[in-house]
Curated annotation (Swiss-Prot):
Residue intervals on the Cytoplasmic side: 1-134, 187-215
Pfam families, alphabetized: Vma12
GO cellular component: endomembrane system; endoplasmic reticulum; endoplasmic reticulum membrane; Vma12-Vma22 assembly complex
Organism per entry: Saccharomyces cerevisiae (strain ATCC 204508 / S288c)
Gene Ontology process terms (BP): vacuolar acidification; vacuolar proton-transporting V-type ATPase complex assembly
Name assigned to this protein: Vacuolar ATPase assembly integral membrane protein VPH2
Record's keyword annotation contains Membrane: yes
Note: Present with 2030 molecules/cell in log phase SD medium.
Record keywords, A-Z: Endoplasmic reticulum, Membrane, Transmembrane, Transmembrane helix
Subcellular location: Endoplasmic reticulum membrane
Length: 215
């Protein structure tokens, strides 16, 4: 935003305006502020000119007052510039207090997750189930790798004229590729499963009694 910079004519007009019969305490304070800042908003200047044209002693036009015309750009307001020292100290205290609460909340969440992981004790049936799942996974991975290796070996032998060492390298490459892909997918599955278990255990069950029936 910008304001009109006071020139000699505007300054003289404001002083006459202040000493006129139309002035009051509030207007005097505003004019003193404008004179001190050496600038005035355009809206205020138009208001003064409109009001005081009714007085024959203060005949003037806005065109005459704005010669020469210069603008005064208002400085950008800085947050907290006019805060008192006590208020600034209170804000700093509230800021540190909020940071402390966030830190304590984060520590509590971390402790709850670690306690859940440490307190997990597997039963024999759960151990057997995990062993079966791991054996099944290893078997499925081996089947996938062997199937791909056999398919590559058969394709390079029947459809192409690759030498034996090239066929072996292709089989080895695709076998390792399938093995790595299966391991990555399985690890991702285990990670998501563990996250789901932790999230489920950290949930707080809320019960609400809707009504009570007495027989």
């Amino acid at each position: 935003m910008f304001e009109i910079k006071l020139n000699d004519r505007i300054t003289e007009f404001l002083r006459k305006f202040k000493n006129s019969a139309k002035s009051n305490e509030g207007i005097d304070e505003d004019i003193d502020l404008f004179l001190k800042r050496h600038a005035i908003p355009m809206q205020s200047l138009l208001f003064y000119v409109k009001e005081y044209r009714k007085d024959s002693d203060l005949q003037c036009s806005i065109k005459e007052l704005l010669k020469p015309l210069e603008f005064e750009f208002k400085p950008k307001a800085v947050r907290g510039l006019h805060y008192s020292e006590d208020f600034k100290k209170k804000l700093e205290f509230l800021k540190y207090q909020e940071q402390e609460l966030e830190y304590q909340s984060m520590v509590k969440r971390s402790k709850s997750v670690f306690s859940l992981q440490e307190d997990d004790e597997l039963t024999p049936s759960q151990i057997n189930k995990q062993i079966k799942e791991q054996v099944t996974t290893v078997f499925n991975v081996l089947v996938s790798v062997i199937s791909v290796v056999v398919a590559i070996w058969y394709w390079t032998g029947s459809s192409t004229n690759f030498p034996v060492h090239v066929r072996l390298l292709l089989c080895l490459f695709f076998g390792i590729l399938v093995l790595v892909a299966d391991v990555v997918v399985y690890n991702s599955y285990l990670k998501k499963l563990e996250e789901a278990k932790v999230k489920e255990k950290t949930k707080v069950e809320k019960k609400k009694v809707l009504s009570k029936i007495t027989l």
